[in-house]
Amino acid sequence: MRKSIARRLLFVYLLILTSVCLHAQYTPDVLGDDYLRRTFQMPDDYEGKVVCTLVKKPQLPDVKQAILYIHGYNDYFFQKQLGDSINAHGYNFYAMDLRKYGRSILPNQNPFFCKSLKEYFADIDTAIATIRAEGNDKILLMAHSTGGLI
């Protein structure tokens, strides 16, 4: 019985995740230089509406490996030199602004507030699903500070 409920919940979660990924689109990012961003509506939490934002450098031709950068506490992705360098070394580059950080802070939220680091799992799962859907077979995680704890 438990396995059946767990499987159904997993199926519903994956269905929602797929739906979220399909409905979001990339737009130019504030970093310029061809950086793009894509904001995902996530399920509401105890403060209401929640989003996370994936930033990327346009994909390199014929490259199927990517690095996903996850920032630390009280931070967000702004180090375009990092993305440029990773791109120059033959990897597609992505960075996640987790919920309530940087591009993902909404007016109803206390910036950086979470009750558990597990809240970020859905944001990272969304990023990984999107990166895979864009043709990357190999994904390496790179993190700073709190991003490494998650």
Label for each model-derived stretch:
Residues 1-26:
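Bacterial Sec-dependent N-terminal signal peptides
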Residues 25-60:
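N-terminal cap/lid segment of alpha/beta-hydrolase-fold proteins
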Residues 57-101, 107:
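Short, surface-exposed "cap/lid" segments of acyl-processing enzymes
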Residues 61-62, 131-137:
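Glycine-rich phosphate-binding loop signature in dinucleotide/nucleotide-binding domains
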Residues 92, 137-138:
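Residues at the starts of beta-strands that form the adenosine-phosphate
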Residues 113-134:
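Alpha/beta-hydrolase active-site loop
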Residues 142-147:
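Gly/Ala-rich beta-loop-alpha elbow adjacent to hydrolase catalytic centers
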